[in-house]
Amino acid sequence: MALISMKNVTLKKQGKILLNNLNWKVKKGENWVILGLNGSGKTTLLKLIMAEYWSTQGQVEILNTRFGQGDIPNMRTKIGVVGSFIAERLPANMLAEKIVLTGKYKSSILYKEYDETELNEARQMLTVIGGKHLLGRIYSSLSQGEKQLLLIARSLMEDPEIIILDEATSGLDLFAREKLLTQVEKITELPHAPTILYVTHHAEEITDKMSHILLLRRGKIVAQGPKKDIITPQVLENFYESPVNIISIDDKRFFIKPQV
């Protein structure tokens, strides 16, 4: 079953083409990395998936909801998001577990009455993904890595079918980054694990649990498919428009180094 389907999708803003004739399908059970340099259109693509943007041409269908015909608000409740634009909206003085609970309401604040059972659900979710030590902490007191872990727990509160991680390791040091990537891998092991869309411009963040890769350059899809078919010198040199070396890291991850 296709969770995401795009057919001949083009998106224009103020006369500028941001996404150009995209054709892409994401099936249940797949975990995708969207890899592209700065300005490639990654964030625009995410906003299209979240129905914050609408295509100028073509057909978009997310979670069996066709844009222009289906129930978009309901569709959005099935997508969890981790990104800096979410982090900036959250109250600085709120407890960690209450931040997680806001994910249940798809809001940056707790605008509804909640009970101890719901708060315990949030505590349990934070514990499951390795954030038990954050319970009782104030959001503003957390490190960048701890905040990202909190946002992941928050995004999982409504048992989403898709979770989007947009530059999730931005601003993290080496150790915090590796810890966060480990937690992302653990998401794939959860019961009813969601499909992951992991957005980055750092190839070394592509972990063993990611099954597929989409290469995006200047709003166009250069290549897409199973990871083993994409991580080849020929495909990557075409994508980067420059010779590169692929350096293996522990046989599961890799580093791409330009030839200079």
Curated annotation (Swiss-Prot):
Single GO MF annotation: ATP binding
Signal peptide from the UniProt entry: none
Give the record's keywords alphabetically.
ATP-binding, Nucleotide-binding, Transport
The record ties this protein, via CDD domains, to:
ABC_ATPase
Q: Which PROSITE patterns match?
A: ABC_TRANSPORTER_1 (PS00211), ABC_TRANSPORTER_2 (PS50893)
Listed transmembrane segments = none
- Pfam families found in the cross-reference section: ABC_tran
Domain ABC transporter, chain residue ranges per copy: 4-243
Q: Which InterPro entries match?
A: AAA+_ATPase, ABC_transporter-like_ATP-bd, ABC_transporter-like_CS, Metal_Ion_Import_ABC, P-loop_NTPase
Q: What is this protein called?
A: Putative ABC transporter ATP-binding protein
Q: Which SMART domains match?
A: AAA (SM00382)
**Does Transport show up as a keyword for this record?**
yes
UniProt similarity note: Belongs to the ABC transporter superfamily.
User: Can you name the source organism?
Assistant: Streptococcus mutans serotype c (strain ATCC 700610 / UA159)
Binding of ATP occurs at G36, L37, N38, G39, S40, G41, K42, T43
